[in-house]
UniProtKB/Swiss-Prot annotation:
It comes from the Bacteria. It comes from Synechococcus sp. (strain RCC307). This is NAD(P)H-quinone oxidoreductase subunit L. The lineage of its organism: Bacteria, Bacillati, Cyanobacteriota, Cyanophyceae, Synechococcales. Its main location: membrane. It catalyses: a plastoquinone + NADH + (n+1) H(+)(in) = a plastoquinol + NAD(+) + n H(+)(out); a plastoquinone + NADPH + (n+1) H(+)(in) = a plastoquinol + NADP(+) + n H(+)(out). NDH-1 can be composed of about 15 different subunits; different subcomplexes with different compositions have been identified which probably have different functions. It is found in: Cellular thylakoid membrane.
Length: 83
């Protein structure tokens, strides 16, 4: 039980701070980039200029999280079927 011993040695104020860091890190690396990928996949051909500019800014901001999902996401359009 080394984890419980580690938690008991921390000051009382440290646990909420660690939980807040974990929540913000999870949102930055997982939640927002996944929502951004789904939004781009759904709206790519219907976006206006302002929406596309905002999306590009968010891609720049959340790039580390997007890199984490990049190997698992396929954004290519479906083909016309077999030739």
């Amino acid at each position: 039980m080394p984890f419980q011993q580690l938690l008991s040695q921390l000051p009382d104020q440290a646990l909420p701070v660690l939980l807040a860091y974990g929540a913000l890190g999870g949102a930055y690396l997982l939640v927002v980039p996944l929502a951004l990928l789904l939004w781009m996949n759904k709206r790519w051909h219907q976006m206006g200029k302002i929406e596309r500019t905002a999306i590009y800014g968010m891609v720049f901001l959340f790039f580390p999280g997007l890199i984490l999902f990049a190997p698992f996401i396929n954004l290519r359009m479906a083909g016309q079927g077999e030739a």
